[in-house]
Amino acid sequence: MDTQDLLQNQNVLVLGLAKSGYAAASILHEKGVKVVVNDQLPFEENEPARILAEKGVEVVCGSHPTELFDLHSIDILIKNPGIRYENVMVEEALKRGIPVWTEVELAYHLTDAPFIGITGSNGKTTTTTLVYEMLKADSKKALVAGNIGTAASEVANQASGDEWIVTELSSFQLMGTYQFRPKIGLLLNVFDAHLDYHHSRKNYELAKQQVYRNQSETDVAVVNLDDETVVRLAECSKAEKVYFSVRRTLERGACVKDGAIMFNGEPVMPLEDVVLPGEHNLENILAALCIVKTAGVSDAAVRKVLTSFTGVKHRMQYVATIKNRLFYNDSKATNILATKKALSAFQKPVILLAGGLDRGNEFDELKPHMSFVKAVITFGETAPKFEKLAEEMGIQQVKRVDNVEQAATAAFSLSDEGDVILLSPACASWDQYKTFEERGDMFVNAVHMLK
């Protein structure tokens, strides 16, 4: 798509200079689009702002002056996905009827390359990685983008028309899309998450539904038959539906039958040959299979990946065995469902390290999955809630610490040979760490210090 035609004579305000905002501002400036950047961080502390200013981009830092809308006759606002809609600049834009994009929408307008859009409450990163690796294993041209790493607009700006752009999409990113239309769209699952941001389950579902909403008859919607909400939300899509199910046998789509992974009634490979740990990953595998078979990937390429792929960093990542204690980093478990799945993967004593940003959740849903938990080490804003949970479960060994580094040390001191020490916080990291990656890296480093 021709960005200059779309944004001709348009004035764009980029709000927030994390990686997506920086990428959007840089690309628009390079294409000659009139752009101004606004970021809360003071200019002298803001390296991305200084780089943009050196390029000739107008940058306003340290506050959010609504005067910018009139001063620059703003037509479109592109915001960092993490910035809430209660932000004064976002509220002002909406009040004026100005579209509020995330850079995923911009990415869509930068290229004719087909998008594979992958979203869901859990499993996005693993599924995105599986799809990308399977495409590459079959010598398909593919790029990976979005919530998983490189900003979508940066990838799209470099993509050729015959490359698949495999894009991990959060609800925050999707909420700021208008015309974004993935050639293949997937909603893995839906449950209560990010309600502090979206304010209601309905709003959260509407954001997730954007992965399907703009699809046409020539597109494909991959649908989880085991999730009633996903099935309902997919009804808006005009695309061909391709289904997968962990629980039932399907003649069309992906499932498991007689110990084999199946697609359209034909065996792809024995389930026992899959090396990716955890039953919860079967959902991700079947979803990825639907996507790549739609894209023409061979069974041989699927088998090549599934017999070697052991998982992604920060998602049930094996870290080390120290004195016969097994350490796992599941820092990407930023919600309750992810931690439920992590706990269900082990049939031996577990020391759970949990806590983080308090979004108002209670954690009673974890109780049925805590039968193997022998101790809880907790930290962050939700520490009191996890202490209460442990008490209600009759867990005697409970300790509150300041951070994940201390949690690793405390867990090791409480552990016995054969124990699993599992960081699976069930909470976002933002009360103490910039990202779940930073939290996970701090934990991994602390574990290695125990050797």
Swiss-Prot record:
**Where is the major localization of this protein?**
cytoplasm
Report residues binding ATP: 120-126
E.C. number: 6.3.2.9
Among SUPFAM superfamilies, the record links this protein to: MurCD N-terminal domain, MurD-like peptide ligases, catalytic domain, MurD-like peptide ligases, peptide-binding domain
Task: State the species of origin.
Answer: Bacillus licheniformis (strain ATCC 14580 / DSM 13 / JCM 2505 / CCUG 7422 / NBRC 12200 / NCIMB 9375 / NCTC 10341 / NRRL NRS-1264 / Gibson 46)
Keyword list (alphabetical) reads: ATP-binding, Cell cycle, Cell division, Cell shape, Cell wall biogenesis/degradation, Cytoplasm, Ligase, Nucleotide-binding, Peptidoglycan synthesis
Supply the InterPro entries for this chain.
Mur-like_cat_sf, Mur_ligase_C, Mur_ligase_C_dom_sf, Mur_ligase_cen, MurD
Gene Ontology terms describing biological process: cell division; cell wall organization; peptidoglycan biosynthetic process; regulation of cell shape
Q: What is this protein called?
A: UDP-N-acetylmuramoylalanine--D-glutamate ligase
Q: Which GO terms describe its cellular component?
A: cytoplasm
Give the lineage.
Bacteria, Bacillati, Bacillota, Bacilli, Bacillales
| Gene3D superfamilies linked to this entry | Mur ligase, C-terminal domain, Mur-like, catalytic domain, NAD(P)-binding Rossmann-like Domain
NCBIfam families referenced in this protein's UniProt entry, alphabetically: murD
The family assignment reads:
Belongs to the MurCDEF family.
One MF annotation (Gene Ontology) recorded for this entry: UDP-N-acetylmuramoylalanine-D-glutamate ligase activity
List locations, semicolon-separated. Cytoplasm
Q: Which domain of life is it from?
A: Bacteria
- Please list the reactions this protein catalyses: UDP-N-acetyl-alpha-D-muramoyl-L-alanine + D-glutamate + ATP = UDP-N-acetyl-alpha-D-muramoyl-L-alanyl-D-glutamate + ADP + phosphate + H(+)
Protein's job: Cell wall formation. Catalyzes the addition of glutamate to the nucleotide precursor UDP-N-acetylmuramoyl-L-alanine (UMA).
Q: What pathway is this protein a component of?
A: Cell wall biogenesis; peptidoglycan biosynthesis
Q: Which HAMAP family match?
A: MurD (MF_00639)
